[in-house]
Amino acid sequence: MAKKSIGQLKLQVPAGAATPSPPIGPALGQRGINIMEFCKAFNAATQEMEKGAPIPVIITYYQDKSFTFSLKTPPVSFFLKKEANLKSGSKEPGKVSVGSISRDKIRSIAQAKMKDLNANDIEAAMRMVEGSARSMGLEVVG
């Protein structure tokens, strides 16, 4: 008989940096999930990824207090800030530009995010990434 799932939890955790401290510990503890077991498994799974990259994780937990988790790719904003060498986006997007990004970099970001985006082809994914770039105050050139 299959285990009965009692819920899902979505978190964004820095790659290789899961610790039992807040916000991870309390979120898992109140659901009865073994915090240290999750931290060890998550850190092992994100070992090859860029340290500190925010990784969205979906944790499914079961009645017997066990859990499974699936990792997503980092958010588009993380890739855009990294490619454009920015600390943060514009405070007034559309009015104040904080930098520019080329279509080639947009394409590489879209390819990296393709499995998590709701897009049928790379062109649609590129349009989504371009929209995020404009919302952050980046100019798309090329």
From Swiss-Prot:
Part of the ribosomal stalk of the 50S ribosomal subunit. Interacts with L10 and the large rRNA to form the base of the stalk. L10 forms an elongated spine to which L12 dimers bind in a sequential fashion forming a multimeric L10(L12)X complex. Gene3D superfamilies: Ribosomal protein L11, C-terminal domain, Ribosomal protein L11/L12, N-terminal domain. Forms part of the ribosomal stalk which helps the ribosome interact with GTP-bound translation factors. One or more lysine residues are methylated. This is Large ribosomal subunit protein uL11. It comes from Bartonella henselae (strain ATCC 49882 / DSM 28221 / CCUG 30454 / Houston 1). Belongs to the universal ribosomal protein uL11 family. One of its GO terms (molecular function) is large ribosomal subunit rRNA binding. Coiled coil: none annotated. The keyword Ribosomal protein applies.
